Amino acid sequence: MVAYSKTIRDIKTLVEEGVVPGVSYAFIDGDQVQSGLYGAEQLLPGYEPLKENQLYDLASLTKVVGTVNVILQLVDEGQLKLADTLHAYLPEWADSSVTVRHLITHTSGITGYIPNRNKMPARELHDALLNLHVGPDFEQKMVYSDINFIFLGWVAEAITGTPIQQLITDRVLKPLKMTHSTFAPSDPTICVPTEVSATRGLIRGVVHDPKAFILRDRCGSAGLFATRDDLVKFEQAILSDTHSPIPDPFRAQIAEDQTPLGTQGRSFGWALLPVSDAHPHQCIWHSGYTGTAIVLDLATNQGFVFLSNRVHPDAPNEPFLARRNAIIATYLDEKRTAG
């Protein structure tokens, strides 16, 4: 197995320079796993060292760990088509041009401003989201938005009668035996904290994302908590294609551009990682606002799990983004060089 010494060095430097409190990480090479952790899980109001088996607020990793798989399973079962319109399942949405494919590839062009969005009760937020509109980017640009995956969750609920977070639990977490992963942690102390908020105080064991906080189990864009080792199980299931949450017909397609124009670097939820060298690769990845990221190479059966709480104690911590991208670049280079 590759030693990944440069990637680990860069992770430790990230912590030592105070960019993040700590990092839990894992490298996957087929059935081999190398994992570790470094740093703290909490700085304020008091210091706590990072421990094994802690739950991380995955933020937008919820989209690809959960919602994407539920949607593709419904398509595979014949309950849904990628060409189906949003309007067909949510009649309150007036526009008839936006399809499931647009939503799952972030090419819907849905836009608009909702005043006081983070202070609305769930029903008001639901109605306000359905009153947004399609802008000029429709189908022409990939513009990442939580709204696309909130709507996908509502589509899945309209079909099954079950809220999206329960569907993710039943269709992904339980079959993969991701036994620690949950949308409702029972004990805050087993969770890595996120922001120290002016309005909410220390956010720990409760979802950080404001829309997910309001919508609760009806949010398909964020809300999942998971341990590093559960995410290793998730990645290995996809890489080995054993009990994969991605249905067989979509296994090959998941590393291909699925946008309507076929040129926007997005698969079903996943972002595609461009690679400029000659090594065979099928790299997909996704990140979460709280400081999380996962990478998969379907050609080489390798994966990377990176979990931090970059919004602790303060958000947004913009310098983190370039450093995270550099760590992923180091990882990709290191695994290819070794290969």
Regions found by a protein language model. Name each.
Residues 96-282:
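Short, surface-exposed loop or secondary-structure junction motifs
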